[in-house]
């Protein structure tokens, strides 16, 4: 119902295309950037970059930060469009927080892999380290 009423964005991401040659022809295996709403990464890789950078404020760029640091680590970003289906409900877009754009540009220049405020700084209610539980 959501797709018919126009509430679903990116309807092309809801179609399963299991045949790799057709996915190539349709350019489904190319990505502009990694979206935080639908991706997976090996635990060891996420730990190596210290997860999401908690220094980002407001809206936007934190998923691109993860993508860049994974690439700086030497990983190639791939796409599962047509294989891992995604339903994205429409919502109004928010403005990106300008300080996040600045932070992302600095990351591009520095080629940094590990963030300061990531998994290793997370604690539970009793103050115990959470990174070791991931």
Where are these regions (language model features)?
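Short amphipathic alpha-helical patches
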Residues: 69-73, 90-94, 110
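Active-site donor/metal-binding and catalytic loop motifs
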Residues: 80-97
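Residue-level signal for alpha-helical context at structural boundaries
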Residues: 63-64, 88, 125
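Composition- and surface-driven signal marking solvent-exposed, interaction-prone regions
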Residues: 58, 92-95, 101-102
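A short, conserved alpha-helix in the catalytic core of glycosyltransferases
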Residues: 33-50, 56-76, 81-82
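Short, flexible, basic/aromatic active-site loop/helix in glycosyltransferases
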Residues: 1-31
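Intrinsic low-complexity, glycine/proline- and repeat-rich
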Residues: 15-16, 111-134
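Catalytic core of nucleotide-sugar-dependent glycosyltransferases
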Residues: 83, 97-122
């Amino acid at each position: 119902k959501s797709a018919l009423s126009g509430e679903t964005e990116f309807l092309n991401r809801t179609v399963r295309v299991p045949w790799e040659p057709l996915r190539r022809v349709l350019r489904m295996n190319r990505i502009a950037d990694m979206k935080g709403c639908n991706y997976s990464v090996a635990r060891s890789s996420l730990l190596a970059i210290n997860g999401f950078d908690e220094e980002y404020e407001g809206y936007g760029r934190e998923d691109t930060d993860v993508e860049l640091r994974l690439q700086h680590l030497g990983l190639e970003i791939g796409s599962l469009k047509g294989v891992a289906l995604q339903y994205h409900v429409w919502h109004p877009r928010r403005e990106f927080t300008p300080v996040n754009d600045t932070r992302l540009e600095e990351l591009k220049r520095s080629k940094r892999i590990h963030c300061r405020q990531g998994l290793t700084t997370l604690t539970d209610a009793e103050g115990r380290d959470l990174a070791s539980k991931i």
